[in-house]
Structure formats: structure tokens, C-alpha cells
């Protein structure tokens, strides 16, 4: 990962001013480079990122194509993008001052891209050392315009691959002109929207649980089997396919597989397959967590679900569930 250029524009919606920086950020300053690069690296692998494709009528796409052909400078591109964002967001019901970070980068595969981050200003407090006739003392002071820390996510962002102009983005709904919209795909970028890998997995799991419960099957067992398939996608680098997830979860049960397939067809927002960030797939697929209505929480490897030597679920005559953990040599308090 390498940050090539970056610029920070200020979108002051309170005063209706779009303050364009006339200079790029100085990336030779370690603090500046660290903030920008870590912001890019963290968001680039965010499993919550949705994907999309520009519509042919997108003005932003035309600007990016001009930039990619070197007929537009980075400064000119960043200025144009900032103006487009400002014009789209200035009519939102609740608008705070937002810094727009525009960066040019190369990823691990040396593919060039442009990234935009919406960094909503926050209030922060710190101390100041003061001196008066009584001596030295400290005082608490407030800062009104503070960038989000690196442990805090940007409220919205987009990555654009300049080789094929594909998109990855995260956005939140905003009230603009009385309507709740996702401003990035609908107003600014003008692109399609496909659920993120994380969203697709969660929706598929919810659908799977519903089918299992309809047939009186333990959804925990079904989900644990499905998660083994999810873990395999991390190992092989293949896309996540909800249909294959259901087939793995209901292996050997054609009736449940058929019902799941029908419900999947009805769920039009769930894609047939989607790329899932490998670290999310591995973390989510290899471990299963459950919480009972009695307040007990259990975390166990998903693969153990098919091994009765480690864990078993039983339905008692009164309809309640029992969980038996086996082969335990030692219990450690945490």
C-alpha cells in the first residue's frame, strides 16, 4: 500500500461554505502520512463495504476517466469531487462540518485508485497548562473541529479502482429534501449498489434460521455447518454463494434445501455471489457463538458441531434444549 497524493477540503454546512484547500497534504510529515495511510488500509479491508458500478450517465465517472487519461490534475479532480459532494449534501436536515479527504493510492497489487473519506468533525476535550499570579495550573478546553481518530470509522467512504472503475463504499442514510437517501450511490457517484459481503452473510444466516425453525430443526446446528463453508471461502479465496451456504447447512436434507432455495429466490436483494473479505470470512466461519435465553454464552469452533465427541444438543420432552459439552479436561476462568 502506498499513498501517492492526498488533499483535505472542508465542507462547512453550517455557514454553507465549501473551503477548498489550494495545496496537497505534505505526506513527508510522518504524522500526516500515518493518518492517511492507516485510514486507507483500515477501510480498504472493511467487510461492510458495498460494491457498485457507475451508470454511464455518471458525471463523476467522466471526471475519473479524464483524470486516468492524465487530462485532469489531482488538484482539479479533488476540487471537482468536493464541489459535487457539497452540492449533494448541503440540503440535508442535520449537517455538521465535514472534512473531505481525497487520496490517490496504490494497493498491494499495485492497482491505482482514488479514495474519498467523509470525516465528520467531532468535539473533543484536552488540557492546557496556564499560568497566573498564583502559579501554574491546568484547565480543560474544548476543541470544536477534531478529525475522527484512527479507531473510529469514517461516516462514509468510497474506493474507486482506476483500472476498471469498480467501486467499494460505505454510506449512511441521510434526510435530504425530506427523503431518506444514500447520498453516495444515489446522488454523488450515481452507481448501482450490491450488498456487502458482511451484509450478505448476515441476511443469508437470518434466512437459514427461519427455514430451520419452520421445520423444527436446530438452527444452531445448521448455521454451524454453513459457517464451515464460509471458512472454506477464506481458504480458497472464492466468492461467497448463499445457495452453497444453504446446501452445506442442510446437507442430506433435500426438503429444507428446496425451501431455502425458494426463499432465496424471493429475497431479491441477496446477490447470487459476493466477495467476502477473507479475514471476516475466516473469523466468522471458524467460530460460532450462541447465547441462551438463560443468559449463558458459549463460543466454540464451528467444526465441532459435527463431532458428538465435543458438543451435542438435545431437545427435552418439555421442548427445552440441553447442551452437552464433552471431553473437557480443564476449565479456565476468563
Spans of features found by a protein language model:
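Long, hydrophobic alpha/beta structural blocks
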Residues: 2-284
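C-terminal structured domains
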Residues: 247-334
Amino acid at each position: 500500500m502506498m499513498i501517492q497524493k492526498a488533499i483535505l477540503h472542508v465542507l462547512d454546512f453550517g455557514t454553507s461554505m465549501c473551503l477548498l484547500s489550494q495545496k496537497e497534504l505534505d505526506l513527508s510529515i510522518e504524522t500526516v502520512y500515518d493518518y492517511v495511510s492507516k485510514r486507507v488500509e483500515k477501510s480498504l479491508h472493511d467487510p461492510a463495504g458495498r460494491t457498485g458500478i457507475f451508470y454511464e450517465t455518471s458525471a463523476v465517472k467522466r471526471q475519473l476517466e479524464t483524470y486516468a487519461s492524465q487530462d485532469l490534475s489531482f488538484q482539479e479532480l479533488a476540487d471537482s469531487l468536493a464541489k459535487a459532494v457539497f452540492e449533494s449534501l448541503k440540503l440535508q436536515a442535520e449537517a455538521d462540518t465535514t472534512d473531505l479527504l481525497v487520496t490517490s493510492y496504490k494497493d498491494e497489487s499495485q492497482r491505482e485508485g482514488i479514495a474519498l473519506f467523509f470525516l465528520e468533525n467531532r468535539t473533543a476535550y484536552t488540557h492546557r497548562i496556564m499560568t497566573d499570579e498564583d502559579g501554574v495550573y491546568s484547565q480543560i478546553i474544548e476543541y470544536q473541529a477534531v478529525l475522527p481518530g484512527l479507531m473510529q470509522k469514517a461516516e462514509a467512504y468510497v474506493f474507486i479502482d482506476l483500472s476498471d472503475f469498480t467501486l467499494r463504499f460505505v454510506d449512511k442514510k441521510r434526510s435530504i429534501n425530506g427523503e431518506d437517501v444514500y447520498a453516495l450511490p444515489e446522488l454523488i457517484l450515481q452507481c448501482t449498489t450490491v450488498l456487502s459481503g458482511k451484509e450478505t452473510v448476515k441476511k443469508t444466516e437470518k434466512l437459514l434460521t427461519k427455514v430451520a425453525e419452520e421445520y423444527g430443526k436446530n438452527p444452531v446446528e445448521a448455521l454451524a455447518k454453513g459457517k464451515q463453508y464460509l471458512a472454506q471461502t477464506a481458504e480458497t479465496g472464492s466468492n461467497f454463494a448463499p445457495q452453497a451456504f444453504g446446501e452445506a447447512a442442510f446437507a442430506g436434507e433435500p426438503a429444507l434445501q428446496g425451501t431455502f432455495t425458494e426463499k432465496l429466490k424471493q429475497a431479491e436483494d441477496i446477490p447470487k455471489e459476493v466477495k467476502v473479505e477473507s479475514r471476516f470470512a475466516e473469523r466468522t466461519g471458524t467460530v460460532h457463538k450462541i447465547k441462551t435465553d438463560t443468559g449463558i454464552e458459549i463460543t466454540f469452533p464451528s467444526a465441532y458441531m459435527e463431532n458428538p465427541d465435543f458438543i451435542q444438543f438435545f431437545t427435552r420432552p418439555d421442548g427445552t434444549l440441553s447442551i452437552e459439552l464433552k471431553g473437557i479436561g480443564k476449565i479456565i476462568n476468563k
